Amino acid sequence: MEKRLGVKPNPASWILSGYYWQTSAKWLRSLYLFYTCFCFSVLWLSTDASESRCQQGKTQFGVGLRSGGENHLWLLEGTPSLQSCWAACCQDSACHVFWWLEGMCIQADCSRPQSCRAFRTHSSNSMLVFLKKFQTADDLGFLPEDDVPHLLGLGWNWASWRQSPPRAALRPAVSSSDQQSLIRKLQKRGSPSDVVTPIVTQHSKVNDSNELGGLTTSGSAEVHKAITISSPLTTDLTAELSGGPKNVSVQPEISEGLATTPSTQQVKSSEKTQIAVPQPVAPSYSYATPTPQASFQSTSAPYPVIKELVVSAGESVQITLPKNEVQLNAYVLQEPPKGETYTYDWQLITHPRDYSGEMEGKHSQILKLSKLTPGLYEFKVIVEGQNAHGEGYVNVTVKPEPRKNRPPIAIVSPQFQEISLPTTSTVIDGSQSTDDDKIVQYHWEELKGPLREEKISEDTAILKLSKLVPGNYTFSLTVVDSDGATNSTTANLTVNKAVDYPPVANAGPNQVITLPQNSITLFGNQSTDDHGITSYEWSLSPSSKGKVVEMQGVRTPTLQLSAMQEGDYTYQLTVTDTIGQQATAQVTVIVQPENNKPPQADAGPDKELTLPVDSTTLDGSKSSDDQKIISYLWEKTQGPDGVQLENANSSVATVTGLQVGTYVFTLTVKDERNLQSQSSVNVIVKEEINKPPIAKITGNVVITLPTSTAELDGSKSSDDKGIVSYLWTRDEGSPAAGEVLNHSDHHPILFLSNLVEGTYTFHLKVTDAKGESDTDRTTVEVKPDPRKNNLVEIILDINVSQLTERLKGMFIRQIGVLLGVLDSDIIVQKIQPYTEQSTKMVFFVQNEPPHQIFKGHEVAAMLKSELRKQKADFLIFRALEVNTVTCQLNCSDHGHCDSFTKRCICDPFWMENFIKVQLRDGDSNCEWSVLYVIIATFVIVVALGILSWTVICCCKRQKGKPKRKSKYKILDATDQESLELKPTSRAGIKQKGLLLSSSLMHSESELDSDDAIFTWPDREKGKLLHGQNGSVPNGQTPLKARSPREEIL
């Protein structure tokens, strides 16, 4: 069962921890060595089956392994013997080396460079065995059998080991005879190259560039190249042996590694060997490969004695900003020999990310650190002297400057608020409260308010209130920060009672939105009034002046807001009723900061190119993010090679060098918080084979008025390379009325409106990229409205913008009452402005199922008749005119009806019977012939003239005739003379004179008759005589005197 070695206690440290291997235990190590050799002998004899593929290589004592970054070492459990460890390694294809340490089997995979690192344990109880597997020998890089061990930068000189006197100082528990006996036993199973060789390491100083030399052997005739195996992270498996001579100390291998310098001269004295510890920047090891250019003598070299120095860098230091300076001192327990000094080298091993600071005295005993940033720093000091070496470690912890807590500040918005019923809910925002760290708790409490069932108490940033009753409220907000500090403030809310006579403005409840939503609609249509509201007006409250916002519909019940930013906006709604009374209400819109979302990458639509076009642009500018996109990256993920991307780090990139095939380009976008998104676009490159396009319109269109819009679909047109332009044209024989919407005559689908009765013909011309074109035609037939003759229009005395849906319903209900039908039977077809102050409403009336439509002229006549009977204020709006939409007057078959004025235009020699128009139904007509009217008028005038002359003549004659006065006389029977008196002006003077001297005057009967004498009253006498006695006409002689009888008469 395998168990990988990660960060675990070092097995070898068990040997080093207590220095329990003292001189008194040497016999135990000798016995252990003997047991090990015996196990190896049994192992080689019992593995004949595995000998063909797995053979023992080199065996080394006092050497251990450590991993070079990854887990290349693993502990094999359940292997109580060396034989079982060897067999398990042979069976595992990944095992090339195993390390037998104190009964533990540690296997290793060192097939790759820099995967393993060797170090010296100086303990004979540590054995490193190399295995040669034929199938992996090349991968491991084993040398021929006559070569020396080379793995992991380890080299040795068997002759120098054999002749070196101080080897017992390194492994005092192993005698020379025992060592060579074990080697002879192992050589029985292996080749001459499998000699077990002790390790002799030579150190050489490195130059200032911190480069490491390689370890080489002096027993080979070849020079080895240095191959560096390094790793920034290693697992320390070290062992240290104590109990040797007092002047010899064995140190664990330092993390930088050991290096040797090859020498061509034989070392005569091991005590005079110079040992220097290199100081590389990164830890590294090297091992040698053979080079036939140089050779060295296989002579013995003395083993150097290295004195271990006890070095202390002091206790760990902990400082707190703003203090950022510290001083580290290195102390060596042993004093340097006379005339010599120690050298110091401080190295930074561990440091925080994004650290900074300054070091002073890196190669001195005292290291001064300054300008440190917060974090943990680990320093190592290396002290070296003549054949002496030591290391010390110290930690420096820099803590950030402690924060001085400031109490939070409670902020409410709005602080003073007033609402009126029927609005019974609102919100108060406390999220704008601030603190130097963080607010962890909000608490709302009602301090004062009307008597209700329960008081308000909530623990939210925004207080939402509902079911409020009239009165004054006071709410307290208490905020608590992360350090427990508190702060409070209050907010006042006034809820007014509803009044019935002025209007009640209601701007709706307060709203809360979260960015990126920056638009909202406020509704003031809940405002009420007992007689109706005539105007609405929205405005930004003075407390919110200066804030950026776009407002639309400020004079309508609905206010549309956009382009809002973070913060609180307060708006005021002012409503006015019919008599000019006004009311206001406020609403607060709280815009909270947004929550970041990943960007949305948009690489644009797929593209299709045709050679010779070999370049195009990739447009990712439509990519979006709720905050901001900070980087773009275009990459080719599929397609032929050879393309070039220009401006690949911008939203719009250019790709050139395209060939025939399909390319896939991927766009990656990132926002400010490093969230990213990807999108791909396909670019298809084709050979240049152009075919003309094919224009195709989907069928003819037939519509019936009042529907006056149509849609012509030319999207079925096709082309092999794609259509680049569409052009719709109207035939010259088509009606000129009708409009094209939104410039759709340059798009695949044509939208038409305001069409009139008739047949339209349209032509579609499509053009491709090469200029080839094709055309197609279609017709749009507009049929007349079948209900045209039954439509009734009424002109209302109201502006069209003031006619609301509610008022319209009330008016339709009144019309239904006049006509005796239901509201649902009146179908309003159109409402449009007639003049600036009037509105035209077009409707028709139908009965209950089967929905038979009433005749329009009958409905109009009935409505006119009912309106004459009713009072003037029966309708909510005054009806200026009621008529049919189409003029249906027959004009007495002597003219035609004007559809606009709804009056007859008579034919020549015909005119309107105005008597009938004024006295009867008022409909225009053409009943009278002009000729007959003239003749009749002439006759009437002549008749009137004659009649008038006759009357005048009669009047004059009657006035000019004098009254006849009766004169009586007594006539004799013989005298039959009669007398006629005619006192007229026509008789003249002579006639009068004749009358005076007539026989009547001189009748004797008058004088002589005494029988009949008539007497006149005095009054009558005077009148009669007065006219005769006044004067004498000119040219007349005085009459003779009358006789008494005449006087009496």
Swiss-Prot record:
Residues 1022-1049 are annotated as: Disordered. Residues 49-127 form the MANSC domain. Expressed in cortical neurons in the brain cortex (at protein level). The modification Phosphoserine is found at S978, S1009, S1031. Residues 1-29, 954-1049 are cytoplasmic. The chain crosses the membrane at residues 30-50, 933-953. The keyword Transmembrane helix applies. Keywords: Cell membrane, Glycoprotein, Golgi apparatus, Host-virus interaction, Membrane, Phosphoprotein, Repeat, Transmembrane, Transmembrane helix. It is a multi-pass membrane protein. Residues 312-401, 409-498, 504-594, 600-688, 694-785 form the PKD domain. CDD domains: PKD. Residues 51-932 are extracellular. Coiled coil: none annotated. InterPro entries: Ig-like_fold, KIAA0319-like, KIAA0319-like_C, MANSC_dom, PKD/Chitinase_dom, PKD_dom, PKD_dom_sf. Glycans are attached at N247, N395, N472, N487, N525. Its main location: membrane. SMART domains: PKD. The keyword Repeat applies. Interacts with RTN4R. This is Dyslexia-associated protein KIAA0319-like protein. The lineage of its organism: Eukaryota, Metazoa, Chordata, Craniata, Vertebrata. The gene is KIAA0319L.
